[in-house]
């Protein structure tokens, strides 16, 4: 292997590393954005769950609020 071949290989490796660095940065940005979205979804799910629980408990009538059956 002569110097020219080594230089070409070095250039190829540097190019691959630069491409990989750019790809890693893009992936990091995507992961960061997804984490933000996951946090928002978790908060929204928490709110919906709380509302659902409160609406279910308000839909249940207390026994003393129930009208007696017709045979009473």
UniProtKB/Swiss-Prot annotation:
Gene3D superfamilies noted in UniProt: 1.20.5.300
Organism taxonomic ancestry: Bacteria, Pseudomonadati, Pseudomonadota, Gammaproteobacteria, Enterobacterales
UniProt-annotated stretches for the region Disordered: 53-72
PANTHER family on file: PROTEIN SLYX (PTHR36508:SF1)
Superkingdom assignment: Bacteria
Family classification: Belongs to the SlyX family.
Species of the source: Proteus mirabilis (strain HI4320)
Protein name: Protein SlyX
A family per Pfam: SlyX
């Amino acid at each position: 292997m002569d110097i020219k071949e080594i230089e070409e290989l070095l250039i190829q490796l540097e190019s691959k590393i630069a491409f990989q660095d750019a790809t890693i940065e893009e992936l990091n940005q995507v992961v960061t954005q997804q984490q933000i979205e996951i946090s928002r979804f978790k908060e929204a799910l928490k709110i919906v769950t709380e509302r659902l629980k409160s609406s279910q408990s308000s839909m249940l009538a207390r026994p003393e609020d129930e009208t007696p059956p017709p045979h009473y």
